[in-house]
Every structure is written in C-alpha cells, then in structure tokens.
C-alpha cells in the first residue's frame, strides 16, 4: 500500500468492528486519522491524558474499566510536537480488557523504540527511515489473522488473510528502497539510532529556551528528536517557516488540523523541528539565529 493512511483504511475495511464503533483516541491523535474514522462512520472518543498529554497505563485502565470503546488508536509519536506515548505499556492493559489496540508508528519507526505489543500497526517507508515515498506498511498480530474480514481470492489460492491486504499493483522500486533503508538501520543498529535521536532532541530543546520570542511546546513531555516551538511575540509561523527555508533551515509548519483534539482551531500554528542523526552545532546555531531574527 502507498502510505500509512492507506494502511489504516485497509484495517478499517477488514477489522471485525461493529457499525458505528467507538474508537478511543488521545487528544494528540493525527488529525487525518480522526477524519478517516469519521468518514468510515465510526465515532472517535477522546481518551484521558495527563498534563503533558500522555495516555498513561493508569488512565487507560480507569477508562477501559468504566467506559471501554470498541477500539484504541494511538500514535506512537505525535506528528505535530513529538510526544511519545507509552504504547508498549498500554498494550497489556488493552488486552486485559479485550479492547484491540492499533498504533500508528509513522513518526516512530526508525526514530524511537517501535516495539509496541499492539494488535495492529500502520507505518510508512519515509520519515525517519528516510525511505521512499509511496510505500506504506500494515502489520497484524497473529491472533487476529483469522478474524479479519478478508474473502479468499481465486487469483491468489492459498494466500493468507494478511497477504491479501497488499495492493495488487506494487510500487516495486519503492519497496526495494524500503528494504535498503531498513537494511541501513539494521546495519547501524536500531538502538544506536534511537539513542542518538534522543540526544539530538535534547540538544535542540536545550538550545531553544533562550531564543527570544519563542517557546518550546510541551517541554516536559516524553519526546525523541522532534521539537515544536510556537511564537510568543505575534510572529506568523507560516512566514517564519518560509524565511527559515530561505536560509537553509528546514522546519515544518504545524497548523491545528494536525491535532485538532489538542490544538484550538484559531491557533496560529507552530514550527516542528525534526533533525536527524547528523545534526551538528552549526545547525543549532543557524536555527537559533533564524528564529531570533524573526522576533517583532
């Protein structure tokens, strides 16, 4: 399939969910995923989180005991500000209550520890793996294979239900590129990459609090390499993003649609900073100077 969104759409099509199923999502859930749930006739319901936006095992336990939804959908890493959810600790809680857990690892694969224990995951080749666009991934835990609503196909006799989830027309070059990206990660060592990216995130967050006119979003939240900053002096984030790009500093403009459950619709936006393992001090200096220069 061509993306994590396409993978999620496939899961929604084949998973044994009741009509109008209630899907528990944290407020930081990726906005397009929530939109997709609604388009499929499902009912996204907000899950409780702590002050940092974290869905803790204790909060999930209380919610599932008192008012369990039919499904949980959690982003391993929130795309708009890098919040890392403790999905590996959430999985046994969900399983104890018989509620399936899906995890979107699009921003987590090749970035943080992506071992989730989930019943299903969706991901993409690009982003932190630095693989090609146009390749998505879906994984389903073995106990669910025979419960998927996947009819047999004469064209593929003997193929299992998960194999039948694949697109008929494959982006073969993209899949090869994904293989190369995965091989590079394994050669380097996933643990070493995760540790370095955590260090990168700390370096960025340590460098930015003193930049006038900007503040770090959720500085106390668990995070990897992603940091988000928002203006405190009335700057236009879209204009700043463009100005920074002109100086060779790449940031991502994050508008409320990325996490409408957490970010008010009238919020002017924030800038996401997502450096990789090759970050050097000069990059941080350029970022800090560029942000400081935009202050009114």
Regions found by a protein language model. Give the residues of each.
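PLP-dependent enzyme catalytic core of the Aspartate aminotransferase-like
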Residues: 246-247, 257-296
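Active-site PLP attachment segment
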Residues: 117-157
């Amino acid at each position: 399939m061509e993306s994590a969104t396409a993978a999620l759409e496939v899961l929604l099509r084949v998973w044994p969910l009741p009509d109008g199923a209630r899907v528990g999502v944290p407020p930081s859930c990726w906005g397009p995923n929530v939109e997709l749930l609604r388009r499929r006739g499902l009912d996204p319901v907000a899950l409780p989180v702590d002050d940092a936006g974290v869905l803790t095992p204790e909060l999930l336990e209380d919610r599932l005991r008192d008012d369990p939804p039919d499904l949980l959908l959690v982003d391993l890493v929130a795309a708009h500000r890098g919040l890392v959810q403790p999905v590996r600790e959430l999985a046994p809680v969900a399983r104890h209550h018989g509620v399936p857990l899906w995890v979107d690892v699009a921003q987590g694969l090749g970035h943080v520890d992506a071992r989730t224990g989930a019943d299903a995951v969706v991901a993409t080749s690009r982003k932190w793996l630095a693989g090609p666009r146009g390749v998505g991934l879906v994984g389903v835990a073995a106990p669910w294979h025979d419960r998927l609503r996947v009819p047999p196909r004469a064209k593929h006799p003997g193929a299992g239900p998960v194999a039948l989830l694949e697109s008929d027309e494959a982006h073969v070059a993209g899949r090869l590129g994904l293989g190369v990206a995965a091989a590079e990660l394994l050669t380097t060592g996933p643990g070493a990459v995760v540790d370095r990216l955590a260090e990168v995130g700390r370096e960025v967050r340590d460098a930015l609090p003193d930049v006038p006119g900007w503040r770090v979003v959720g500085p106390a939240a668990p995070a990897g390499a992603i940091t988000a900053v928002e203006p405190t002096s009335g700057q236009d984030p879209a204009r700043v993003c463009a100005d920074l790009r002109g100086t060779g500093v790449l940031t991502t403009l994050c508008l409320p649609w990325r996490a409408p459950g957490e970010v008010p619709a009238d919020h002017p936006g924030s800038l996401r900073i997502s450096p990789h393992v090759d970050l050097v001090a000069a990059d941080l200096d350029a970022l800090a100077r560029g942000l400081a220069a935009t202050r009114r």
